[in-house]
């Protein structure tokens, strides 16, 4: 089998195509959620906390010296990313929960006779 034919078969398998679509949609969804958090949620939260802009919250570990920039710990951006994560995780949880509801429940295979019942049948057959 040629290399290209093998690659084509691999790429056209359902799982690979589904995963590629999921990654593309996930990337776009991540941008939407980041915009929601950065442009809608955080400004409202900033107003509720007295006009604080979370993007600017930071601890200065070392001041800027000459051309060397300051060393900062940007905890405001971290808080914003935590909000991003929580919203994305909740949305994925809700999608998985919805998909699981749509799946048909797996029917259990009919239970066969127990070992004791089989042994009793064998015993009865041997008595004949």
Curated annotation (Swiss-Prot):
Entry's localization field: Cell inner membrane
Main localization of the protein described in the UniProt heading: membrane
The UniProt record lists the keyword Cell membrane: yes
SUPFAM superfamilies tied to this protein: Gated mechanosensitive channel
UniProt GO cellular component terms: plasma membrane
Membrane topology of this protein: Multi-pass membrane protein
Gene3D superfamilies: Large-conductance mechanosensitive channel, MscL, domain 1 (1.10.1200.120)
Key words of the record: Cell inner membrane, Cell membrane, Ion channel, Ion transport, Membrane, Transmembrane, Transmembrane helix, Transport
Gene Ontology terms for molecular function: mechanosensitive monoatomic ion channel activity
Transmembrane domains' residue ranges: 10-30, 76-96
Complexes and interactors: Homopentamer.
Family designation: Belongs to the MscL family.
PANTHER family referenced in this protein's UniProt entry, alphabetically: LARGE-CONDUCTANCE MECHANOSENSITIVE CHANNEL (PTHR30266:SF2), MECHANOSENSITIVE CHANNEL MSCL (PTHR30266)
Protein's job: Channel that opens in response to stretch forces in the membrane lipid bilayer. May participate in the regulation of osmotic pressure changes within the cell.
Name by which UniProt lists this protein: Large-conductance mechanosensitive channel
Species this protein is from: Mannheimia succiniciproducens (strain KCTC 0769BP / MBEL55E)
Gene from which this protein is expressed: mscL
């Amino acid at each position: 089998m040629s290399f290209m034919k093998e690659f084509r078969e691999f790429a056209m398998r359902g799982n690979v195509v589904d995963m590629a679509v999921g990654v593309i949609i996930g990337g776009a969804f991540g941008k939407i959620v980041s915009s929601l958090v950065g442009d809608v949620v955080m400004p409202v939260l900033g107003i509720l906390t007295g006009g604080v802009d979370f993007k600017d919250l930071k601890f200065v570990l070392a001041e800027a010296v000459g051309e060397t920039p300051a060393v900062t710990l940007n905890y405001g951006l971290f808080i914003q990313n935590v909000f991003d994560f929580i919203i994305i995780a909740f949305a994925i949880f809700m999608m998985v929960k919805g998909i699981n509801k749509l799946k048909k429940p797996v029917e259990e295979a009919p239970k066969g006779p127990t070992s004791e019942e089989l042994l009793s049948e064998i015993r009865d057959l041997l008595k004949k």
